[in-house]
From Swiss-Prot:
Annotated zinc fingers (THAP-type), start-end: 5-57
GO cellular component: nucleoplasm
Species this protein is from: Xenopus tropicalis
InterPro entries named among the record's database cross-references: THAP1/10, THAP_Znf, THAP_Znf_sf
Origin superkingdom: Eukaryota
One Pfam family named in its UniProt record: THAP
Main function: DNA-binding transcription regulator that regulates endothelial cell proliferation and G1/S cell-cycle progression. Specifically binds the 5'-[AT]NTNN[GT]GGCA[AGT]-3' core DNA sequence and acts by modulating expression of pRB-E2F cell-cycle target genes.
Protein name: THAP domain-containing protein 1
The keyword Metal-binding is annotated on this UniProt entry: yes
Keyword Cell inner membrane recorded: no
Amino acid sequence: MVQSCSAYGCKNRYDKDKPISFHKFPLKRPLLCRKWEAAVRRADFKPTKYSSICSDHFTADCFKRECNNKLLKDNAVPTIFAHTEIKKKSGKAVKKEQLPAEPEPVPSVPEVDPAIGLLLPPLYTPSHIAVICDHNYTVEDTVHQRRRIQQLEEQVDKLRKKLKIANQKCRRQERSLEKLEREVSEYREAKGSGYVIFPGNYYEVLNENEYKELAPEITYKEIIL
């Protein structure tokens, strides 16, 4: 189904070669949707999930700048509507299509809520509609999504690099730990054997176990070199 503009007299239809975007009625936001309906000014018009307004009916400040005028800001309301000129088939005078006359404003009477006994806030009419453009609420293309995906992919790459560096550090620490364990083991093995050097003309070097066999009454630690 080809998208077309629901504005009165607008003949814009979706064309990928034209810089015109289409924005669906905010049906999930009743208050804002009623503002759109009032701005369109079409009698007995009820928007559906397929109804949309083209970007020609929104002012420039209603769009997010970084999205090339394809993303509306929050609470944006269409305000640009021109009278449609219809030419007669006979080629005579061109008449302007008259829009339905607006009803006379009815003075609002404050209402009292019987439950709490307080005045209710006044109802706002189309004349009170104000264009408030703050945040995006609709997405007509995938520019924002693609940009977000690209950012996430960059973050994943950075985390992978950090993980690789951390793994390399862990492997180096494991090798250092294994080296220290070998040194400690070798030191303990070497510490189990001792040597005694006798003074004077005795230059024989005896193993501790051999010395104990020769002089069992003297301990190895009592020998003064």
